[in-house]
């Protein structure tokens, strides 16, 4: 009996022993987490019976014991327990741990919001322990004025002239389904409200019921996407964030900026047309290596975004009509209202409107003006809807809004008139919010970037030159290509007609340009050329835009990704700027994109980070020499291996003079949810980007000392050499990578619309950056992040012990170096070589075991050296909050790691011996109709033994949720 009682000790109690103590007075994380877990375990018992719930607890306890002492025997015990489950139970247990991790993440988010609110209530911004990830706009303005002695006017001028353009991308998109994200949002809301101070007992009871309902609904939802998403699906998923948080979040944030300005003595608001925040998208425009993004997809995505924008404005315009009921107005507005009133039909009624459906009387002039705007918005939306659904529309284009100024003008007229009549307070209400939305989102909601590989343009040019019988463009030297392209750009003759012989690929490139020509130009942002290496890459796109009759050509942005391309980028840019035709074309403005993912895959994180830093400095020097304003577009991934990390720090650690109030950065699919998933997250994201961009411009970080640069150069050579000697030159590496990680099985997740490889055959170099990072994240070994650091530190310290002191100075005084080290330290805090060792024992052939051991030794050595450089005794000693959060998650993740390793073994070796005691534990409650076995039938086409594929995918999703950075 005592034994049974012991076994029933809940995870909740276990958690309380395991978890670190409270980090601060307002720390409610353990409380939140325990409540969610208790509720979930009760639900699990109701749905699947006590035995299965006990099994989940037993698994958790073994995992928690492993976390205490890291004894590999505990992992084997865990493995035995897991392999003793039958197929249905296996899915339920894996699903339970994946679900518990998602709940732990939600508890964290609510705790972060709770701490933030408390901090704001106290007006306390001194708590620097979380300044590593925070940047408050009010705090930044005060710091600039009171500490840096900048004048309030200087700060205001800098702020209203700066632009942050956030570019939402689809790859690899969420590894959590949207159906679940919505349920998670409701769990978050219930949890926040449950802990509100003034809650009544009845409210508490109802909220608790709602909480349980949402937890159960999420658990009962199939976590696995059964079909891969199309680019249109990805676009709709991305657009849902505008609908839910970004649309209302932008004016709310800009109001907070106004308030912060007031508090430093500026009695002006940020002008509504100041482009503080802009949004762009790659969803449906990024065709680099994704054959599913066709010209038709691009057209659909633009029409969809236009329809959504018109719909969002339309849904608000009646509220504005209610608000602006005044009769006083200036002469300009009265004349316009009279003209519109005169031209409208005498007894016109619009039965499809709910409010103001009859003709508006002239003594409500603002409503007359806004009524006309509403009519046009309605037709704009309907025209886009018909074009999208049927390919044609009976609504003439001239009856709709086709350009931004035409939409803005009547709204500005209302604003001016209200101010003229002494009603500025009214003008600065909903109308100002609406104007700010129009200035931010325009008629297209987001601007779509087009991205294509440079080789595809070369193929088109080659077809043209062969058709003209002047040779093969592909075989020409760079000089000859430039000479020919420029002669054509200066000339007027058309290059080709409909008789140009084309392949499917060439037609696809040309049709994309035709779609750009056909649609309004405000739909599009930049044309990005990936794998750009030379000036001809840019000139070729300029020529194709002209040939395809694009009236307002897109700005052309070269993307430099590989290490060699980054090194050659400044020279390529200087050559471009020295061409008179090109300088006239760009009108003093150029954008360059730098890629973090591929440079990291090519040379390792250390060398990539340093090369990206130097390349930016050199590119800025080139631009200054030619008096060109350069905007850097940062293609950062969501994970550290792909250039991710806390926004505020990442921006503040950029080289001086490289941002200058103009920043473009990708917000990767896998982090969109944690950036914009909820109102307070959206607010925090906009605040961090705006504040950090302002601070970088007004208080640039100091340049590194010459001796620091010299040391970095030495270390980068060593780090690249070690990284490449293992990843590209070690003959055992590819086999080891494929066996020790779920790389081969990654494609089953149906995460994104892009194939995992650029070319179907080939080694590591053909893998996209995501399937390269994702498998290492799954095994918690994170090799692409740390490989190279250890040998670089070791060699320079062995060479001269003074170098250790220099590295410590660099860490304390140079933001770039500190951020680079801190991010790797954070990855070490999430890593566990014990899991990699288990994978080796189960999945890797014995002759590769010494190689795995060698890599794990490098991991430990690198970690030790990193802590020496940072002068830390243990990882994350400077960030108790993050440390606590990671410790809470570890036991769940470890369970999923072990589950994954044993499942992979059974998938790859169907004859592998497993426990025979496979009686189903799961018992459905009397009310339930489907036993756990039915979960196996959700995947009838699996080529593996029942339940294995789903269990594997659930572990992948769970680990991704736990690591909070997918790939």
From Swiss-Prot:
InterPro entries from the UniProt entry: PEP_COase (IPR021135), PEP_COase_bac/pln-type (IPR022805), PEP_COase_Lys_AS (IPR018129), PEPCASE_His_AS (IPR033129), Pyrv/PenolPyrv_kinase-like_dom (IPR015813)
Keywords: Allosteric enzyme, Carbon dioxide fixation, Cytoplasm, Lyase, Magnesium, Phosphoprotein, Photosynthesis
Localization terms from the record: Cytoplasm
Entry-linked Gene3D superfamilies: Phosphoenolpyruvate/pyruvate domain
Biased composition (Basic and acidic residues): 924-933
Function recorded in the entry: Through the carboxylation of phosphoenolpyruvate (PEP) it forms oxaloacetate, a four-carbon dicarboxylic acid source for the tricarboxylic acid cycle.
Oligomer status and interactors: Homotetramer.
Entry similarity comment: Belongs to the PEPCase type 1 family.
Name the UniProt record assigns to this protein: Phosphoenolpyruvate carboxylase
Organism for this UniProt entry: Pisum sativum (Garden pea)
Lineage per the UniProt record: Eukaryota, Viridiplantae, Streptophyta, Embryophyta, Tracheophyta
